[in-house]
Amino acid sequence: MNVDERSRIGGREKDAGPGKGILKQNQSSQMTSSFLENPGVRIPTRIITKKEVLDGSNTTSRINTSNLQSMVKRRVSFAPDVTLHSFTFVPEQNNEIKEPRRRKTSTNSPTKISSQEEPLVTSTQIDDARTEEKTAAEEDPDTSGMELTEPIVATPDSNKASQHDPTSMEMTEVFPRSIRQKNPDVEGESIESSQQIDDVEAVREETMELTAIHNVHDYDSISKDTVEGEPIDLTEYESKPYVPNSVSRSTGKSSDYSVERSNDKSDLSKSENKTNSSQPMEITDIFHADPQNPMSLHSDNNINNDGNEMELTQIQTNFDRDNHHIDESPSEKHAFSSNKRRKLDTVSDYAASVTTPVKEAKDTSGEDNDGDLEMMEKMSPITFSDVDNKIGTRSNDVFTIEPGTEDTGMQTATDDEEDGENVDDNGNKIVEKTRLPEIDKEGQSGIALPTQDYTLREFINEVGVGFLDTKLIDDLDKKVNFPLNSFNFVENQRIDNVFSAFYIDIPILEVEAFRCKELWRSINESKDKFKDFEAQIDKSHPPLLLQEYFSSDEKMKQLMRDQLQLVKGYSKLEAAMEWYEWRKKQLNGLELILAENLNTLKREYEKLNEEVEKVNSIRGKIRKLNEAIKEEIRSLKNLPSDSYKPTLMNRIKIEAFKQELMEHSISLSSSNDFTQEMRSLKLAIAKKSNDILTLRSEVASIDKKIEKRKLFTRFDLPKLRDTLKILESLTGVRFLKFSKATLSIAFLQLDDLRVDINLANFKNNPLSSMKVMNDSNNDDMSYHLFTMLLKNVEAEHQDSMLSNLFFAMKKWRPLLKYIKLLKLLFPVKITQTEEEEALLQFKDYDRRNKTAFFYVISLVSFAQGVFSENGQIPMKVHISTQQDYSPSREVLSDRITHKISGVLPSFTKSRIHLEFT
């Protein structure tokens, strides 16, 4: 059975699914005898297994990622001569016993180091995987696929081993690196070092309060105590264990080189592939590693050129794990946890390799892992130098280094050593000297001495950049001398005299006090900032500047001191510049105040000068008058008594003076009446004053009741304006303006007739308060109609005058329509009688008889004839003719009724009553 027939049979057996290929061609027409005899067609001779279908097809969800590199040149053609086949779906089988999501890893025995990998399957392929275990063990592990999120363990191609790409990644997995030691001597030293680290771990304290960062050791030597159902949160941080003192770390390049030389490379790679692939990734878990399995460390980014530590994690590929495997004894083989990846919010530029003590099973139960990991994401990067040094200071074992490798490891000293014995007489910390490994020159170039934490105070004292500047203090030689210091002077002077003496100096003292307060505030603010900065440095890792300074030689230290002195001088000049700018602004403000005071004093001085000039002029007049009176008195004393003869002018003045005295005597006699009248006026004034006070109190009480806030804001004006326009269009009344108490409106229904309403008198007399403005542009008909409406409004409904007027206008609106229609038939005009009655006059001309008929009807009668169907309509007619023609009343009634019947159907012949004039 060929492939095409098998696909068609599978399509018929399936209820749902496509029966033909995507290209919609006739498949049966191609299966001819010539087609089968074609030597280029390959017909299968055996049943294709499921594994071959999965490996060879690109239409399934199971993708073989391990063979991607070998299948790069594979091309899939979708030409018209190629047929795409449909496949039946394998139904999921319900098993009575559900396989756990995390399967126990098989321990690696020393006799089966290079055992083959077990194929990975999903939950829908468990039965097939069980039947194919033996087949999968005999085949190449590179052909095994990957299901969903299971870890991928791919062995780098031996032909490409020289590329040494430590950053290549298979799919989206991130793998931690492991180191392989091919030297058998290293294994013995590792076992001995693990025993010492076990003793140290018993007294170590965990450095992280939230989620610990743990070490993942050799993947063939992990503890078997891993709980199968352990929850996994996000991604586990996997790093290397800290090896005390000087630790040999081999780079990925040298490890690849050593692995490439090894003979059992393929066996170890397959064994590790099996171990890693059997651990599915179920999102993440926080993993506590066992510190009793130390191993050689390596890192590509532990120390950069600036000497900064690297924090948190390192990204390592699966190639490094294959190339850095460590062989261990069977007693130290452990099960290993699944690889996990983590996505950090902030990627740190530096990372440090750390390890944490082993916790009990209840500590790693996963109760607080979710919250701890979330907080850990926010708080990273975090330094772990205290954890590193607790191990580093208690262990003296040193691992060896392979020849030809480069060491990039580093050790740190923590603040916990301050309390120990490594402190000198001055209280400074002394870095513990470590025993370096005996390696060649090439390996020695990559080893860094341990670092030490330094405080900001120590750095400032060492460099000599203090904050107290004695030069500035010495320059302040200006002193304020107070003469009140003597005891006798204080006793002899009163307070007003002292105040008067120092009145000018008091503002200067106030300015100086304000200046001192500003300096004091600035100094306190600087102190607080310095304390905060010092606290931040104490709590965090020492800055790069401190590490570089204390790790440099004397020449470099002197250069750094000179640079810091230069920076200090520049900062001091900047601070002085800011201070002088502040002083300048203060002095400018004082100058403005003094200028304002000077102008005020000048104005007062000018006023005083004017007053002095007035006083001097009055004084001069008084002096002259005094001298004249004295001269008159002397002259009168010297003259005899009979020698005085008054002149005519003097006599006239005397008579006038006498008349004035007589008038005053009369008013003096009537002083009682004046007194009584004054009393009555005072009483009236007091009464009016009381009335005013009561009225003011009433006004105040009314004001309290009225809400003071604004009813409308400026944002409400556009909305109110639009509302007013809508009301104008609905009612036909337009508001023109509102000035004082006069409201001007225009009626759209009456050809924009303008009416002014005085709201002050509207309540008392509505009719008189409304004034109709008869402009020349408006039609007289609207004016007379509105006047008629005002007269016809009932007097008893004056309270609702405007509403009644509006309803009447709405009711009489058709009257304008009939008048306009009448204008289309006859020339119409409106006249007014002496009684101010509006008359409607229209003209009818008879061409045959050359006679003109003038009909006159009052506006009220015309309105009654329009709106009512009963009653007589009085109409006057005047005949103007050039011939002797005098038609009868019947003829005129028939004529006028015939002409206006189409416009005014209510004007019938029986209702029209003509009167000849």
From Swiss-Prot:
Keyword Phosphoprotein: yes
Post-translational modification Phosphoserine, affected residues: S77, S380
Compartment(s) of residence: Nucleus; Chromosome, Centromere, Kinetochore
Ranges for region Disordered: 1-38, 93-172, 235-282, 324-343, 397-427
One GO CC term on file: Knl1/Spc105 complex
Knockout-associated phenotype: Inviable.
Ranges of compositional bias, category Polar residues: 24-36, 106-126, 156-170, 245-257
Chain ranges for the short sequence motif MELT as given in the UniProt record: 146-149, 169-172, 232-235
SMART domains the UniProt entry points to: Spc7 (SM00787)
Main localization category: nucleus
GO BP term (any one): protein localization to kinetochore
Biased composition range(s): Acidic residues: 414-424
PANTHER family, per database record: SPINDLE POLE BODY COMPONENT SPC105
Protein name in UniProt: Outer kinetochore KNL1 complex subunit SPC105
Organism: Saccharomyces cerevisiae (strain ATCC 204508 / S288c)
